[in-house]
Structures are given as structure tokens and as C-alpha cells.
């Protein structure tokens, strides 16, 4: 298994809304919000439109998948170059099945966020100086992931399929088989610190 940590799909959603700019981290040279993702046009409406958000999110997911696979390919190549695990490989059958292990952090958070945008009204609170979304207000009720509600669960099915399809479009190291895992606990504690929330507009905290 070529292990490769995980991708923060919740942060990716914020990049889709803010045109690839990071709402928390500044460029050291310019002092302005860092342009991390592709410089797409940000969403400027007062309330988020589901179709508009989804269209931009698809593009940002595809960019993230490409970056993710490229970095993991480099990591696995350098690992084999400088520390090939020959002792462990000696115990493996002749026909080796290699998997390319990707992962997702913030899965349920993205589902709840998209669900809030689709089924309720989400108002964007923008930074007065940068114009970037930095908080959200929700008006109305919306289905949440983990409650056996197909409206939320179907968003999760779409999200997993979309991201894994984007992963599979890329060449993986040694033609390994792309897989993904939906991770919890430690990854969501760390990754939550880099986020502002949509479905739960609070200060940064661990995401579920």
C-alpha cells in the first residue's frame, strides 16, 4: 500500500467559494490572502446558490485531486529510491497488488455544508478588507449526515464518487490501484483548525 495521508475536502469547499484564496493565511510578500488554489472567480452573492457552489466545487476538487496524486507520486518514488523496503517485500507473493491509498478529511462537514446550502439559506459574512467569506449564517433547517436521511446521504455518495473519479483520472505510482478512506479522529482535529465552518458557523474546532 502506497499510503498518502488525506485531503481536506472541507477546506477545498472554502477555496471554491473564495476563488482559491485562503481566508486565514496571508501571503508573506504581499500581506494579502494567499492564493492557494486556481484563481477562479469567487462567489460574490449575499446568499450561496447550490448550483453555483457545486459547479465551482467540482473544478476545485479536480484541481485538488491532481495536486494530491502528484505529491503522493513524488513521495512514494523518493521513498523507494532512498528506503526501499526489501525485507518486507521479500515476504510478499510474486504477483504484488499495489494500492494507492488516498483519504478524505471533513467528509461529513462537506455533506452538512452542501445540505445547508441546498435545503436552507446560507448567508455569507465577508471580511471588510479582503472581501472573502469568513463566516456564515444559516436560515432554516436542513438534513444532516448520519441520520439515515437520503437527502444528506446522497450528497455523500456524490462527493465520494466525484473525488475518487478525479483521483482515478491521474497516473498513479507504479500503476497502483487508487483507493480512498473516509477518516475520522486525528485528521479531523488537525484539519479543523484551518477551517471556518458553514454548516456550524463557529470558531475553528475539530470537524467530524
Model-derived regions: residue spans:
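Single conserved hydrophobic/aromatic residue that forms the stacking wall/gate
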Residues: 197-207
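Structured mid-domain segments that build the active-site/substrate or prosthetic-cofactor binding neighborhood
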Residues: 1-141, 208
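Gly/Pro-rich turn-and-neighbor structural signature
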Residues: 59-63, 80, 84, 147-195
Amino acid at each position: 500500500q502506497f499510503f498518502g495521508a488525506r485531503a481536506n475536502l472541507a477546506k477545498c469547499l472554502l477555496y471554491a467559494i473564495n476563488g482559491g484564496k485562503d481566508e486565514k493565511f496571508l501571503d508573506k510578500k504581499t500581506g494579502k490572502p494567499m492564493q492557494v488554489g486556481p484563481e477562479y472567480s469567487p462567489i460574490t452573492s449575499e446568499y450561496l446558490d447550490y448550483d453555483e457552489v457545486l459547479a465551482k466545487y467540482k473544478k476545485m476538487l479536480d484541481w485538488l485531486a491532481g495536486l494530491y496524486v502528484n505529491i503522493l507520486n513524488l513521495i512514494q518514488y523518493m521513498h523507494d529510491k532512498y528506503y526501499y523496503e526489501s525485507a518486507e517485500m521479500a515476504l510478499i507473493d510474486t504477483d504484488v497488488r499495489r494500492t494507492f491509498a488516498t483519504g478524505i478529511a471533513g467528509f461529513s462537514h462537506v455533506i452538512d455544508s452542501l445540505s445547508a446550502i441546498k435545503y436552507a439559506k446560507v448567508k455569507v459574512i465577508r471580511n471588510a478588507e479582503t472581501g472573502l467569506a469568513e463566516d456564515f449564517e444559516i436560515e432554516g433547517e436542513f438534513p444532516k449526515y448520519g441520520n439515515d436521511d437520503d437527502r444528506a446521504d446522497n450528497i455523500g455518495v456524490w462527493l465520494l464518487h466525484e473525488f475518487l473519479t478525479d483521483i482515478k483520472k491521474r497516473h498513479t505510482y507504479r500503476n497502483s490501484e487508487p483507493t480512498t478512506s473516509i477518516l475520522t479522529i486525528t485528521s479531523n482535529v488537525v484539519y479543523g483548525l484551518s477551517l471556518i465552518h458553514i454548516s456550524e458557523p463557529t470558531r475553528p474546532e475539530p470537524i467530524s
